[in-house]
Amino acid sequence: MSRSLKKGPFVADHLLKKIEKLNIKGIQKVIVTWSRSSTIVPIMIGHTVAVHNGREHIPVFITDKMVGHKLGEFALTRTFKTHTKKVNKKTKR
């Protein structure tokens, strides 16, 4: 279920303030955040946000195609190890 339009997208206040400061100064700097549930809004385009995945911060460069998605979608929390292949062992008789 999507969020109500009258509420608008959720963006953490501290994250929004940091991005607005950097936009005013014109500085490109990595912004560290734990807020995986924040929605990407158009003022974030061109910034790099380091999103916490539970163990470390993953740098995510924001492009225009990412607008409307959540930050957590781009910092995967689980590492997939490939399944082991079946080895047919033929025994000699």
UniProtKB/Swiss-Prot annotation:
<dbReference type="GO" id="GO:0009507">
    <property type="term" value="C:chloroplast"/>
</dbReference>
<dbReference type="InterPro" id="IPR023575">
    <property type="entry name" value="Ribosomal_uS19_SF"/>
</dbReference>
<keyword id="KW-0694">RNA-binding</keyword>
<dbReference type="InterPro" id="IPR005732">
    <property type="entry name" value="Ribosomal_uS19_bac-type"/>
</dbReference>
<dbReference type="GO" id="GO:0003735">
    <property type="term" value="F:structural constituent of ribosome"/>
</dbReference>
<dbReference type="GO" id="GO:0019843">
    <property type="term" value="F:rRNA binding"/>
</dbReference>
<comment type="function">
    <text>Protein S19 forms a complex with S13 that binds strongly to the 16S ribosomal RNA.</text>
</comment>
<keyword id="KW-0934">Plastid</keyword>
<keyword id="KW-0699">rRNA-binding</keyword>
<dbReference type="Pfam" id="PF00203">
    <property type="entry name" value="Ribosomal_S19"/>
</dbReference>
<dbReference type="InterPro" id="IPR020934">
    <property type="entry name" value="Ribosomal_uS19_CS"/>
</dbReference>
<keyword id="KW-0687">Ribonucleoprotein</keyword>
<dbReference type="GO" id="GO:0005763">
    <property type="term" value="C:mitochondrial small ribosomal subunit"/>
</dbReference>
<dbReference type="InterPro" id="IPR002222">
    <property type="entry name" value="Ribosomal_uS19"/>
</dbReference>
<comment type="similarity">
    <text>Belongs to the universal ribosomal protein uS19 family.</text>
</comment>
<dbReference type="GO" id="GO:0000028">
    <property type="term" value="P:ribosomal small subunit assembly"/>
</dbReference>
<dbReference type="GO" id="GO:0006412">
    <property type="term" value="P:translation"/>
</dbReference>
<keyword id="KW-0689">Ribosomal protein</keyword>
<keyword id="KW-0150">Chloroplast</keyword>
<protein>
    <recommendedName>
        <fullName>Small ribosomal subunit protein uS19c</fullName>
    </recommendedName>
</protein>
